[in-house]
Amino acid sequence: MRIIHYIDSIKAGNLLSDYLLRLTTAQKEYADVKTVTQQGDFKKLLADFQPDIVHIHTCWEYQAATHANWAAKKQCAVVFSPHWELDERARTTEQKSTKKVKTLLYQAKMVRRVDALLVSSEQERQDILKLGWTKRIDIVQDSVLNSSLSDDDMALQTISFYRKVLDTRYQFAMTAMEKEAIPSLLHVGLAQETTHNLLPSDQLLNLRSLNPEQWRRIFLYADDEGIREIVDNCISRLQLNAPTIDTAAIQR
């Protein structure tokens, strides 16, 4: 998994900066992780790195909203952590008039457009739900504030959240190989004849070249389209090396 984290700046002794540094350091054990700040070239990193997930950690900034929109246009999954900046106190006591304008111009739109929000407590989740902008909100506690939670556990829970988001929008991630594989799987799965030459060699090679992530997306698609039994029949007939994945247990 390839992840880009965006934050306005990294500051020594800053609570949010400490959180992000601990999160990204732990995540690097399980994923390819990059961090970019306001001073970095976000668009270039997005094009060069081609992330699966863009995680925005900055609220009330037009540049952050622009980056979220740009990443979405590039078919990246975008998640947003407001870090308590959307609770009532932050909205109504700090730069109240300015934030009202920003809400109308871009902040509410950003929240509605991202794939999901990630917050650190149920109270923060409830505060955001009251706004009515989105219901797609998950919780992973902050190891900086919760000493009983290790950085590693926080990283793993966050990556599980990313996986949930990716599984929800799997069709955006489907490659040409997967899209070409679907008709082949259906052809063999539905075929009445039992000959060994049910597919041309190039189509058979395509099926045998699929990796576990590609099979995962194919299985999710097959479940959603009601063709899983046909796909499984093809896998059995051709003795394809497909992973065993219980898609019914996948949270989306």
Task: Describe each model-derived feature in a short phrase.
Residues 140, 144-145, 149-174:
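C-terminal alpha-helical cap of glycosyltransferases
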Residues 112-136:
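A short, active-site helix/loop in glycosyltransferases that binds the activated sugar's phosphate group
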Residues 100-116:
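Membrane-proximal helix-turn-helix segments that form the acceptor-binding/catalytic region
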Residues 3, 53-55, 70-88, 118:
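Active-site proximal beta-strand in glycosyltransferases
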Residues 45-64, 77-79:
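Short N-terminal targeting/anchoring amphipathic segment
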Residues 107, 166-252:
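The feature captures the alpha-helical scaffold/lid subdomain characteristic of nucleotidyltransferase
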Residues 1-39, 151-156:
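N-terminal subdomain of nucleotide-sugar transferases
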